[in-house]
């Protein structure tokens, strides 16, 4: 009797967000977990989410710079793996808190800290199970002009200023104003 393959549905990073799913404004960051600048940006994002609440949706997309941060790729994969169990944001914040210690064994410990009980977590990391999802993020980032993280977009427009609370707030406020000015869609007969 031939063995049957198990079909596994993978939740992509594009489907992992926090905030209001139907918000008219999406803040998207391309970042990585070993970068000091990305860690600072993560703190700014926390302030932004506190300020805007359900007026926006935030997505983090992976852009590990493996030439200078060798462990950033596996860290990104571990975040995607955590997302499969609904623990992406818990793992995301733990990775930034521990950005100087992102070896595979540490990632396994952080997964427990995030509340992940998946016995296959380490196997998935070692086997690169979620590597394609991270590579897809990198590819899309390159297509959008991302060169070095952190890079932010508000409704698909790159924020070219330094990602401070003030600069991101201005970009979000502008997008919120634009979304209010749009005429209501006409119903088809």
What spans do the regions from the language model cover?
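A short beta-strand-turn-helix
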Residues: 8-25
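Short clusters of hydrophobic/aromatic residues that line enzyme substrate/ligand-binding pockets
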Residues: 17-18, 102, 159
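C-terminal cap of thioredoxin/glutaredoxin-like
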Residues: 26, 30, 37-47, 109-189
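Structural alpha/beta surface segment adjacent to cysteine/selenocysteine redox centers
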Residues: 28-113, 117, 173, 182-186
